[in-house]
Amino acid sequence: MKADPIEILVSNDDGFRAQGIRELAEALRPLGNVTIVAPDGPRSGASAAITSTLPIKLKLRHREEGYTVYSCTGTPVDCVKLAMNTVFKERKPDLLVTGVNHGNNAGICVIYSGTVGAAMEGCVCDVPALAVSLDDHSEICDMSHATAYAVHVSRMILKNGLPQDTMLSMNVPKGKPLGLKPCAVTDGRFVDEYMASEDARGNAVYWMTGRQINKGTIEGDLELMHAGYVTLSPIKLNMTSRRYLPVLEELLKRSV
């Protein structure tokens, strides 16, 4: 009996028209059937936001053998949720890949990123997931290294799987990488986050800007990416601080 083909779901937070998702999907096609379900426009910084008070729409944009494209009016996580409940209702995809994001999602960016947020939804749905981000914010940029590494890691995931509550976040430097390194996420934060300005009527407005710094001691994904390496960080869905949990229990006992 002929085995079912591999099914790959692809999403992002830059929108279905973005260069990154188009080139990623094309690179993944030799691995199996590829289905894009992505926002109908940019949704950067959407994190794990969902739409709960408005209806969302799913629109078929393109279909050919082994390759289908849908746009969704919701957030990146909406896209994955809706895909699981419609397109993949009868059979879950074998792999979820998000990106390629135009801009890195290293360090503290993981909690803000729609690209990572969409991949985390894969953990919720028990689907192995990989988020791919390139350290280049240009609308048109060289995606060749990012897509090549994405395919390499996707093959590894399809062969070996991932823990049920863990996804992988990949950050690719601009230019030719020195190699691939597994690492922790940098314990960072943003400084100088907003630039003050005025609108046409003289009212104060603020533009998001800023830069990320390492507030910890671990050399993580941000530093290694800046040093020229492709970084690969395992991220858990369950955010419980298990190290602090027994401490909390003891403190509560004392406070009674």
Curated annotation (Swiss-Prot):
Textual note on the cofactor: Binds 1 divalent metal cation per subunit.
Using the UniProt record, name the top-level EC class of this enzyme in a single word: hydrolase
> Mostly located where?
cytoplasm
GO MF, one example: 3'-nucleotidase activity
- The organism's superkingdom is given as Bacteria
**According to its UniProt record, where is this protein located?**
Cytoplasm
* Keyword match Nucleotide-binding: yes
What this protein needs as a cofactor is:
a divalent metal cation
Q: Which InterPro entries match?
A: SurE (IPR030048), SurE-like_Pase/nucleotidase (IPR002828), SurE-like_sf (IPR036523)
Q: What is its EC number?
A: 3.1.3.5
Q: Which UniProt keywords apply?
A: Cytoplasm, Hydrolase, Metal-binding, Nucleotide-binding
Q: Where does a divalent metal cation bind?
A: D13, D14, S44, N101
Q: Does the keyword Coiled coil apply?
A: no
Q: Can you state which reaction this protein catalyses?
A: a ribonucleoside 5'-phosphate + H2O = a ribonucleoside + phosphate
NCBIfam families, from UniProt? Answer: surE
PANTHER family in UniProt: 5'-NUCLEOTIDASE SURE (PTHR30457), 5'_3'-NUCLEOTIDASE SURE (PTHR30457:SF12)
Give the UniProt family note.
Belongs to the SurE nucleotidase family.
Q: Which HAMAP family does the record associate with it?
A: SurE
Relate the protein's function as given in its record. Nucleotidase that shows phosphatase activity on nucleoside 5'-monophosphates.
Q: What is this protein called?
A: 5'-nucleotidase SurE
Q: Which organism is it from?
A: Porphyromonas gingivalis (strain ATCC BAA-308 / W83)
Q: What is the lineage of its organism?
A: Bacteria, Pseudomonadati, Bacteroidota, Bacteroidia, Bacteroidales
What gene is this protein translated from? surE
